[in-house]
Amino acid sequence: MEKTPATGSAVAPPPVEYGTDSITKLEGREAVRKRPGMYIGDTMAYGLHKLVYEVVDNAVDESLAGHCTDIEVVIHVDGSLSVQDNGRGIPVGPHPKFPGKDTLEVVLTELHAGSKFGNGAYKVSGGLHGVGVTCVNFLSEWFKVRVHRNGIVYEQAYAQGVPDTPPREVGTTDKRGTHIAFKPDATVMELVEFNFETLSQRLRELAFLNAGLHIVVRDERTNKEHDFKFDGGISSFVEYLNKSKQTLHDKPISFSTEREGVMLDIAMQWNDGYDERIYTFANNINTHEGGSHLSGFKAALTRTLNSYAEKGSLWKDLKETPTGEDAREGLSAVISVKLTNPQFEGQTKTKLGNSEVKGLVEQMVNDQLGSFLEETPMVAKKVVAKIGDACRARLAARKARETVRRKGVLDGGGLPGKLADCQIRDPNESELYIVEGDSAGGSAKQGRDRRNQAILPLRGKILNVEKLLREMLTSAEIVTLITALGNGIGAEDYDPEKARYHRIFLMTDADVDGSHIRTLLLTSSSGRCRSSCRRAISTSRSRRSYKVTRNKKDQYVKDEHALNEYLLKIASEHARVLTPGGELGGAELKALLEKVITYEERLEKQAKRRDARVVDALVQGARLSAETLTGRGCPGGGGEGRLMTPSSAACRTCWAACATSWCRTPSTTPRSWCSTPTRMEPCGRRCSTTPSCRRRSTWSCRLCAEHLRGAGQGAVQGPRGRGEITVFSVQEVLAAVRKDAQRGLGLQRYKGLGEMNPEQLWDTTMNPATRTLLQVRVEDAVESDEIFSLLMGEAVEPRREFIERNALDVQNLDI
């Protein structure tokens, strides 16, 4: 800002006129593209996948109306996505209230246009606001719709919400339904890459909620596919939630009923765990924050169970009546309501607001659950006994907390002796580092920023709370952690407003023990200690493992991949690849080497299931057959049976050891390489009919066509006249420049935190300007809970099956 010579004060900005012409109104497409967050929540992962859900919800509404049985969702390789259903199809034809506009175009370009506002076409629906598919159109780079209706196929395309042409007939059909394909607009959306697992989680929910609805989701980028169809409906959902648990009764308690226009479906089952997992839905929309239907269920559940137990004098030995938390301990339940006019709190529909629903749900649960308990006394007594045990455990835990509190450990007045607190008291600015080991904790205390960084060293492996929850408060390390966080634990003591730190960092060694400790800490934060960490941003520290010294200057890199990137940067700055066809260096050489590294990484993944040398030969275009694989067509003359690649000698050695069945069906138009001492050019298009081989061949062809011409036989020349190295393949180029880049470098690897002094810990791990963080987020609570129960729980057999099933996919194996 300029300052006047006389006073040194800032020059005032020019006045801004604020009059009637300052008031503007955004409408339709312009409003959505200008403020997308108002319609889809945000422009990151949530909003991106919200676009898909809006389209899918329309297909599900067709299913609710009884007109759709199949939905297919496909993520395409170009980043687009398509949704196909076999419903009635969007109506096509002139619209009576929009002269000159087709009904299909009205649906896709007019906000709040649809057939879900009356009680005609749809009795219930989730897409009440009428902006869903229109927003998808407006926020897409391109959008295409194909409608099969009344024996005719109609198509229309859009670019950023603007129609290219009116809907047109393109053929006849005996099918029906709507096919929508779109590609998110990167100029509006910050994230445009769809996550297969995120979509699968939501589509699985929809298949559970709509018994018999068949949903397929496929990812063409990775060839992953999930096929969902559950005839058991939400009962199957509850069984899925409890599949890694020991259940209290064999089958879920389920019932469906309706009262005053509200349809209620409930399924629930208790297990021997301690956490409640209740998922609520309104018109198939996942109401993450609950609402009136959840409130009604909780009230009715507690009242009905207490009434049944008191009537039979089943809790006469208890010192106090069990609470709602006791009744829901170990409960997995799914609550689904369907109503004509749902009222959601906000466009994102995360909480149901219909006040009348609470009373109706409460009445229906009272009646249905009460009847079930009377009719099945064996199950009822097991449930009541479980609740009684939960009440006794809660009272015992309260007594233990009070005992510990009297000793000054859990109360707010005394902090753990190990904790080196920070000076700031604002939780939003405070950071807590949970450090493995007292030695590393001491160095971290010396190297930290005392203003806002607190250090809590923990010794050894903490308790696995997934297995030993009852003993949790007897563990000194767990009590220390709870006390340091400050927001308590359990329904009675938990208060999120008392959290002392809103950012938590886990710092462990880069070895198997450190990984184990980090897993135990994450288990505690995901299980019963979840409430203590709910307000915190749980962050796992990715510590930098290498120190590179070059020209007397130190630089830290976090892992081997980053180290290779660093070496590649150095190599491309100085090294040159000399060929008769020209010289490669700088950015061009770096681009080539990055492609080769990617190729080698993909080849390494293939090695887990097949011989990587054969894969490499196939990808490079070798014409392999049963004869060549067994060695009968091996070396010698120029027969077609031999590998025609510069690296054929290395590949030949593996032929005899490879199973001929790996490439059972050789292509009739095999790909081969015509090689000369200086040039390689592809002379075919296909390599093998094996799908994985075709995918890799496509990539390899692109690599060779763009970068490998002229990079066959040649020489790698190092800087400052270090000499030349003759090479015969791009892999040899990569090895040569890597070796040259490492000359004169000092390389030190840090495996343990204790190996670093305070200054190094600050530079690599704690300095906000240079540290690298890995944030831990729970995007799929169901899958998260299942994996923790499976891998950290008491049941051994499911864990062994999981390990055997995924053994070949392991990435970090410590032997």
UniProtKB/Swiss-Prot annotation:
Single GO cellular component term: cytoplasm
Name assigned to this protein: DNA gyrase subunit B
Leftover remarks: Few gyrases are as efficient as E.coli at forming negative supercoils. Not all organisms have 2 type II topoisomerases; in organisms with a single type II topoisomerase this enzyme also has to decatenate newly replicated chromosomes.
Cofactor remark: Binds two Mg(2+) per subunit. The magnesium ions form salt bridges with both the protein and the DNA. Can also accept other divalent metal cations, such as Mn(2+) or Ca(2+).
HAMAP family: GyrB (MF_01898)
Name of the gene this protein is made from: gyrB
Binding site for Mg(2+) 2: 509, 511
Cofactor(s) listed in the protein's UniProt record: Mg(2+); Mn(2+); Ca(2+)
Biological processes annotated in GO: DNA topological change; DNA-templated DNA replication
Cited CDD domains: HATPase_GyrB-like, TopoII_Trans_DNA_gyrase
EC number of the protein: 5.6.2.2
Organism in which the protein naturally occurs: Myxococcus xanthus
Subcellular compartments: Cytoplasm
Catalytic activity: ATP-dependent breakage, passage and rejoining of double-stranded DNA
Pfam families cross-referenced by the UniProt entry: DNA_gyraseB (PF00204), DNA_gyraseB_C (PF00986), HATPase_c (PF02518), Toprim (PF01751)
SMART domains: HATPase_c, TOP2c
Record-level Gene Ontology MF annotations: ATP binding; DNA binding; DNA topoisomerase type II (double strand cut, ATP-hydrolyzing) activity; metal ion binding
Location (main, coarse): cytoplasm
Positions annotated to bind Mg(2+) 1: 436, 509
Marked site (Interaction with DNA) residue numbers: 461, 464
PANTHER family xref list: DNA GYRASE SUBUNIT B, MITOCHONDRIAL, DNA GYRASE/TOPOISOMERASE SUBUNIT B
